[in-house]
UniProtKB/Swiss-Prot annotation:
GO molecular function: L-tyrosine-2-oxoglutarate transaminase activity; pyridoxal phosphate binding
A Pfam family it matches: Aminotran_1_2
Transmembrane region(s): none
EC number(s) per entry: 2.6.1.5
Enzymatic class: transferase
Similarity remark: Belongs to the class-I pyridoxal-phosphate-dependent aminotransferase family.
Induction of the gene: Up-regulated upon coincubation of the fungus with the terrestrial bacteria Streptomyces iranensis, Bacillus subtilis or Pseudomonas putida.
Name of the protein described by the UniProt record: L-tyrosine:2-oxoglutarate aminotransferase amt1
GO BP: any one term: biosynthetic process
Domain of life according to the entry: Eukaryota
Gene that produces this protein: amt1
InterPro entries: Aminotransferase_I/II_large, Class-I_PLP-dep_aminotransf, PyrdxlP-dep_Trfase, PyrdxlP-dep_Trfase_major
Amino acid sequence: MVYFATSAENSKTSYKVDLSHHLSRETRARQPNPIKTIWKIAQTKVGTINMGNGDPHNTLYPISKIDFVVPSLDQPNPVQAWKEGNSKTDIISSYKDESCALSLKTAFAYGTGAGLQQVRGVLADLNNRIHSPPNHTVSLSLGNADSLTKCFRLFGDPGDSFLCEEFTFSPMTNAALPLGIKWEPIKMDKGGLIPADMDKILTNWDERTQGRRPHVLYTVPCSQNPTGSTLPFERRKSIYEIARKWDIIILEDDPYYFLQYGLNVDQFIVEQHGFTRALASVLPRSFLSMDYDGRVVRLDSFSKIVAPGMRLGWVTANNFFAEKLDSLTDSSSQHPHGFGQAFIAELLGDGGWGLDGFMKWTKSLCDEYQRRRDLFMDVFRREVGINGFATAEVPKSGMFVWIKINLEHHARYRVVKESNGDPRTNTAALMDELFRTLLDSGLVLIPASTFAITGSLSPPSGDCILDVSICIDGVGAIAELPLSIFQRVNYFRATFVGTDETICDGLKIFGRTIEQFFCF
């Protein structure tokens, strides 16, 4: 049975929960950008002569037209044809002085923090077809790194603790440290974040000794970075109910959402509802799609499905949070990427691929990445896993394979008992040695210690040389790993999105090197 969360169904439960207490002191103190406030008012007055603006006049822009040459979707496998250089192509154009989806006069001018309505509108339509959230607002961003760091400022005060997976994308968690935000790690298994551990942390939290109970969860639910795990639906439901129980805001950072593998699109649904709805019926249910209260802030990006350098994404939040986020952008990065907005407006508009066409391209992209994943796993089993020194789960989505190094088989692996009876191993030292040996052999894999969250990270206190052999706190100070996670850094993150040659050559190096390492 296929389930669609319809807008009509969700409209029965509008956002009535007061979430204003989650805002940071910075957010509460922020004043609107006064010039942009006047500009917004002026936009509502038809025929008003604007002599108060400070941007160059569009007649002086040194550009009048942009032609985008894109793959034609009128072929069975557009990504494969594009990759092989024999694709049919279409040309979609943006104009300054002629009719198009988004005039370059508008795209290249100063704008509001939320981004241009021509792009926001089509992305709101995409959201409605896939997630059907009630009373939501779409704001554009410069990609998920931009929107996430702004969310840290939106919700975090110095001394706050936020929740996250125990292994996570450290460049983002590090970005919160100078704000005085600390991280409380939640244990994981191959299914991702463990809801029971999240609830245990919140239940046992002592505000007298630990400060304010965490009120924000940062999570990457699909192809979690670095582990590649994807949260099952039942876990998502449990996590959301725990968030409601403890009044938690969920930052749903989901850049890999559209890169799902093994999906079978029902042609009957395509004929009845269109390709986007058909694909939505087999995509994972998002936290946004089950949000009763408006406590989910969802972050999407074009970085993984179009190009990372375009720096364009979108944030979906309740109207109240969206207004505060837009105000922050108005007074910082000003507005999203103009070139990117022009391209996406044309690509997703009536003169381009449209939403259904864009989803067809995304599905074709998934098929290609799935082929590369399967190649990676086949070569891995043959070149690396054959001796049992390393193992890996097959990822269901995204770009990463989380490779476990079975150090217990190494001749120099040691376990000693501490005075309190807890075991301590030399895992970190052996992993550091293997990392450096691989590097000397011409292969870079990212060690698990790079992503480990200790639960004791603190704001910067000084600079020193970083050492990848143990967990880095991201600000220059080397942090001791707690014992529980210290024993579990025997992993590497690898990517399978490179060329076939890169995958094969890299795994051959890995196989030779790890065999020498274990036999030394």
